């Protein structure tokens, strides 16, 4: 059995890792950590785990964690991850980091959007963990930068168009909507029930959302040239899910049927990407609790613009499920192991 630690297990991505790995036939979760809830069974923090996972949360130094396990998942906020990841790496442990700390290749860019990087020497070692595009690199990696939730939905939604040079890379506009779990479990006034319920609002407007450099980095690699996008996130009064509506201008005349065929060929054999038939569009309700990314494509006949809509569960394909998918690849296991999760509907 592969022994794993979940560092930062008292957040939403942490408990989602526990939920998924509990059914993984090759994994034993042997260490879960939390500063605030140390000494308590994890099931007392998350009653949904009662009777199935009662492991006690610990507050350990990185060395103590590394001594117990083979692989470490760091489900920590940015900066907190880069304070502990170097120790795990020095002790020979594979690390899958769910924070933003190792996603951006350039330390100066990271510093502009976040803060000065504490260990920029590790950035070249980190592999951006989007399996559909980096499968071979992930299999050889010892440090995975697990992608963000919005970036996952946008990158998977645009990859075939950019690789196929079907669209003008300068024309990309993204409107993306997320459930409230994307903001984490910490208490914030903006996430209170009365602030969110019966409302729908934009935030991070005007090119200031921190996922923008991550998205642009990966889309630029796909396009073969640097590009900028217009990205506007929105908050939806639901627990989980992301729906991204992506607009772009094609380089020539295109038909929806041809674009769907392009996507089907690009994602042929991918276990977690579902390209929908013409006239069928994704819904977050149909991916909830699963590792799927559903993609629908159409063309605005009046303006000629291509419209791609992608739907994911922000806590699964947008975080913990993709992390387990990466772990499977790193360990030489079947990629879908532990991830055969049917969406929860209704």
From Swiss-Prot:
It is found in: Cytoplasm. InterPro entries: AGPR_AS, AGPR_type-1, NAD(P)-bd_dom_sf, NAGSA_dehydrogenase, Semialdehyde_DH_NAD-bd. Keywords: Amino-acid biosynthesis, Arginine biosynthesis, Cytoplasm, NADP, Oxidoreductase. Its main location: cytoplasm. The keyword Cell cycle does not apply. The active site is at residue 149. The keyword Cytoplasm applies. SUPFAM superfamilies: Glyceraldehyde-3-phosphate dehydrogenase-like, C-terminal domain (SSF55347), NAD(P)-binding Rossmann-fold domains (SSF51735). Its EC number is 1.2.1.38. Pathway: Amino-acid biosynthesis; L-arginine biosynthesis; N(2)-acetyl-L-ornithine from L-glutamate: step 3/4. GO terms for molecular function: N-acetyl-gamma-glutamyl-phosphate reductase activity; NAD binding; NADP+ binding. Catalyzes the NADPH-dependent reduction of N-acetyl-5-glutamyl phosphate to yield N-acetyl-L-glutamate 5-semialdehyde. This is N-acetyl-gamma-glutamyl-phosphate reductase.
């Amino acid at each position: 059995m592969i022994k794993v630690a979940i560092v930062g297990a008292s957040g939403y991505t942490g408990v989602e890792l526990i939920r998924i790995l509990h059914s993984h036939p090759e994994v034993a979760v042997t260490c879960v950590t939390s500063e605030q809830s140390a000494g308590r069974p994890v099931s007392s923090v998350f009653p949904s785990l009662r009777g199935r996972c009662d492991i006690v949360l610990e507050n350990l130094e990185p060395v103590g964690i590394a001594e117990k396990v083979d692989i470490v998942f760091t489900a920590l906020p940015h900066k907190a991850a880069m304070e502990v990841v170097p120790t795990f790496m020095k002790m020979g442990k594979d690390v899958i980091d769910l924070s933003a700390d190792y996603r951006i290749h350039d330390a100066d860019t990271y510093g502009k959007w976040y803060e000065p990087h504490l260990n920029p020497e590790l950035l070249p070692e980190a592999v951006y963990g989007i399996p559909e595009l980096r499968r071979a690199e992930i299999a050889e990696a010892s440090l995975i930068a697990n992608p963000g939730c919005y970036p996952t939905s946008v990158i998977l939604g645009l990859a075939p168009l950019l690789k196929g040079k079907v669209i003008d890379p300068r024309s990309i506009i993204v409107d993306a909507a997320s459930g409230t779990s994307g903001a984490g479990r910490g208490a914030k006034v903006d996430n209170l029930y009365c602030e969110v319920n019966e409302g729908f609002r934009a935030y991070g407007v005007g090119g200031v959302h921190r996922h923008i450099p991550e998205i642009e980095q990966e889309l630029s690699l796909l396009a073969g040239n640097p590009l900028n996008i217009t990205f506007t996130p929105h908050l939806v009064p639901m627990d989980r899910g992301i729906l991204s509506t992506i607009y772009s201008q094609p380089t020539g005349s295109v038909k929806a049927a041809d674009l769907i065929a392009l996507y089907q060929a690009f994602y042929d054999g991918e276990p977690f990407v579902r390209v929908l038939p013409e006239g069928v569009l994704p819904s977050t309700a149909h991916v909830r609790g699963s590792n799927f990314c559903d993609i629908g494509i159409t063309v605005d006949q009046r303006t000629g613009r291509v419209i791609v809509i992608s739907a994911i569960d922000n806590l699964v394909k947008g975080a913990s499920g993709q992390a387990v998918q990466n772990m499977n690849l790193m360990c030489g296991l079947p990629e879908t192991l532990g991830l055969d999760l049917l969406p929860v509907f209704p």
